[in-house]
Structures are given as C-alpha cells and as structure tokens.
Amino acid sequence: MLSRALKVWSVMVFALGSSVWAQSRPAHSKEPVSSGRPLSQWIAELKAPAPQTRNAAAYELAGMGAAAAPAVPALIEALDDPVPAVRYPVTIALLEIGPAAKAAIPRLQQMMDEEINDEIAASARRALKRIDPTAVPRQ
C-alpha cells in the first residue's frame, strides 16, 4: 500500500512540477533575450524614470545587435532623452542594429547638426555610416 501511495505521489509531483515550470516560462519566449530578460522588457526600460535604467537598457539593446531591430522606434524616441548618458548608448544601439535601423536616419542626421555634445554627434555620424553610408553628408 505504501509503495502504491508513493508512486501516486511521485506522479502527482512530476505532473504538478512540469506544469509549474511551463507556467513560469515567459509567454514571450520567442523574443531575443539579453541578460535573462526579453527584448520587450529592455524596450520598456528605455522609458524608465531613472536615467541609469534607461542607459543600461540602451547598452543591452546595443549588445543584441540586429536582433534588437524591433526596438528602433523606441530608440528613435530615446534620441531626445534629456540626459546625454542615455542619448550616447542609444546611438550605439542604432549603430549595432545596422541597416535595419534605417528609420532612424533623419533623426541621426539632425543630431549631427544640432547635438551640443560632440561625442554624441560623432556617435550619431558613426551610426549613420553603419546604417547607410550614403546617408552621411559630405563635409
């Protein structure tokens, strides 16, 4: 009797354990992941209140390269962040995404002319060269 009860108990534990595991997997598991978090979470963090969080999100997206292409609209918005320490890694993320970031070309061209921080303006230029070399104005 005890052995039968143990068998039933072990089957229940196995069944419950696997369903708990399945429920704990993120529904967005097909998204690219960086540092254990899905792309959509990093995109959302570009709008976080803390600039350190926005900075970290931009660098994580940069590290994802072309896989972060769905983040381009949010990255374009983030180019207007009031904090230079956020704008800079956003330009890096667009550079790393490459040609899939073509939608950012007009804003990056504008940044080259209007950005008061020379490092960010230069990074915008490098991003443009990577996205589409013909989009970089001749000097």
What is each residue range found by the language model?
Residues 25-33, 52-67, 77, 85-100, ...:
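Structural detector for internal amphipathic alpha-helices that build alpha-solenoid repeat scaffolds
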